[in-house]
Amino acid sequence: MPTTTEQPRSMWDHYTVTIQFVGPLAAAIPKHPKAILAMLEHRQPARVPKNATPLPELAEQVAEEVGADEEAPVGYATFKSDEEGPYYEGRCIRGHLKDCALQVASFFPETKNFRAKFVNRVYVQTDKIPLFNRYGKERIKTFSGPELRFIQVMTAQGPRSSLKQVDYIDSPRIQFTLAVLADGVIGEEHLRRV
């Protein structure tokens, strides 16, 4: 067998992505323990895997990550935080990328089933994405403030209105790493459009 000094090509291309938000980034995770459990129940798959974490245990974990408070209004939303400050989750970025891939699919008519190909080739490598100030130099330690939002929903009993309190961070910057399968189907131009 011949020997070579050439390094094998990696299966993955890695990209560092920086996003500068213009305006507030609003939180989406409930702060009240009962609302956390209700959110998890709503998002639970129809077929729960045998080795899945039980919902009460998962709700307790999320409650700890958001600093849940029984006194918080049921409609209060906040961010997960660790000892260094609030953070965004990689799984949320992946969800945004999936939605965006659907929206820009028509830009790439030569790539059949663009969204499916994108979703199966692009992975967010960073689980906890810290939030930095707009200059990217300082980690954000606290929220910019809460905002009251008037919301309306249609229910079986008719339209309903309520107030929702949402923590927000003004114009944060985030940075994370994407791993893209290096098979030539999804490249930098696709990533820039998405």
Show the residue positions of the predicted features.
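RNA-interacting cores
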Residues: 1-194
